[in-house]
UniProtKB/Swiss-Prot annotation:
Gene: tsaD
Protein residues bound to Fe cation: 111, 115, 307
Keywords: Acyltransferase, Cytoplasm, Iron, Metal-binding, Transferase, tRNA processing
A Pfam family it matches: TsaD
PROSITE patterns, sorted: GLYCOPROTEASE
Organism domain of life: Bacteria
Organism, scientific name: Gloeothece citriformis (strain PCC 7424) (Cyanothece sp. (strain PCC 7424))
Localisation per UniProt entry: Cytoplasm
Cofactor binding remark: Binds 1 Fe(2+) ion per subunit.
Role summary: Required for the formation of a threonylcarbamoyl group on adenosine at position 37 (t(6)A37) in tRNAs that read codons beginning with adenine. Is involved in the transfer of the threonylcarbamoyl moiety of threonylcarbamoyl-AMP (TC-AMP) to the N6 group of A37, together with TsaE and TsaB. TsaD likely plays a direct catalytic role in this reaction.
Binding site for substrate: 134-138, 167, 180, 184, 279
Record SUPFAM superfamilies: Actin-like ATPase domain
Protein name stated in the entry: tRNA N6-adenosine threonylcarbamoyltransferase
Record field: catalytic activity: L-threonylcarbamoyladenylate + adenosine(37) in tRNA = N(6)-L-threonylcarbamoyladenosine(37) in tRNA + AMP + H(+)
Length: 346
């Protein structure tokens, strides 16, 4: 039963947590949203500098909230890939320093594996095998979860990730950053059937469409053309209806692919991870479809959908219990397929 101090700095949240297997003792998140809103997206250098300023206060607060000290910690973990290089380096450098100082083993964690483990934190009885729909700002993936560190990629996006599409469409609608929660909020008072938008489908060379891969560039372009047409006609933007129609199309597309994949692979359980997992339309459509097909579907609580260190600690605890440790020589990586997770361990 390992107690892990974990650090997550892969993008624009400085996060520190203390977890014991699947129990959260503390989960501190310092968001940088306000800093990046001015730029309409994450600025890597700004993110790195802010991580440097907030990492120590977050570490202190994590111990205070958990009411623990260093003698209670068995291992130290940090996200090592994928992510922004400068941002990752802040968290990993802090974790390695603490590992040496307090003589604790270091566990490097794959960010996407962390999102998978967010479901374990809210569903203690969840066990592989299951299908994970991982939808975030940088990824849209259908992952066959076979065991700790053992994954098969069944579907992915060919262009924009779902979260990225939300941000881009939000800009088209003259909304702020981050786009996901703002579009969701606007959609609550909009008509999801006001506009017919194309679902993202990926053509195969031999004909037909890939059953599990996604594409959101065409959907984004369709919204752009609608906006341009309305502006040319000097009409006001029906922002709420556009937001609802866009969100409905994304949710419907992801639901179809996820259910098809689960049925094709005889997987009876679906877990959802990533920030887009907080989207109300996706939760509604996927829950309804799963019930119709006698499948179980698990969504983490909203606070565990977005980046946090508790999910990193949960993944690290599982690796710790299996004797998987990372050398201090390990570096950070901007990209690393989740199928190569075990390369992080000796």
């Amino acid at each position: 039963m390992a107690t892990i101090l974990s650090i997550e700095t892969s993008c624009d949240e400085t996060a520190v947590a203390i977890v014991k297997n699947r129990n959260i003792y503390s989960n501190i998140v310092a968001s940088q949203i306000d800093l990046h809103q001015t730029y309409g997206g994450v600025v890597p250098e700004v993110a790195s500098r802010q991580h440097l300023e907030t990492i120590n206060p977050c570490l202190e607060q994590a111990f205070i909230e958990a009411n623990l000290n260093w003698s209670d910690i068995d291992g130290i973990a940090a996200t090592v890939a994928p992510g922004l290089i400068g941002a990752l380096m802040v968290g990993v450098s802090a974790a390695k320093t603490l590992s040496i100082l307090y003589q604790k083993p270091f566990i490097g964690v794959h960010h996407l594996e962390g999102h998978i483990y967010a479901s374990y934190l809210s569903e203690p009885d969840l066990q592989p095998p299951f299908l994970c729909l991982l939808v975030s700002g940088g990824h849209t993936s259908l992952i066959y979860v076979k065991d700790c560190g053992i994954y098969e990629m069944l579907g992915s996006t060919r262009d924009d990730a779902a979260g990225e599409a939300f941000d881009k469409v939000a800009r088209l609608l003259q909304l702020s950053y981050p786009g996901g929660p703002i579009i969701d909020r606007m959609a609550q008072t909009g008509n999801p059937h006001a506009f017919s938008l194309p679902e993202g489908r990926v053509s195969l060379p031999e004909g037909g469409y890939h059953p599990y891969d996604s594409s959101f560039s065409g959907l984004k372009t369709a919204v752009l053309r609608l906006v341009q047409k309305l502006e040319q006609d000097h009409l006001s933007l029906p922002v709420h209806d556009l937001a609802a129609s866009f969100q409905e199309t994304v949710a419907r597309s992801l639901t179809k692919k996820t259910i098809t994949c689960a049925l094709d692979y005889n997987l009876t359980t679906i877990a959802v991870g990533g920030g887009v997992g907080a989207n109300s339309a996706l939760r509604k459509h996927l829950t309804s479809a799963a019930t119709e097909h006698n499948l179980k579907v698990f969504f983490p609580p909203l606070k565990l959908c977005t980046d946090n260190a508790a999910m990193i600690g949960c993944a690290a605890a599982d690796h710790f219990n299996r004797g998987h440790f990372s050398p201090l020589s390990i570096g950070v990586q901007s990209r690393l397929p989740i199928t190569e997770v075990m390369k992080l361990y000796q």
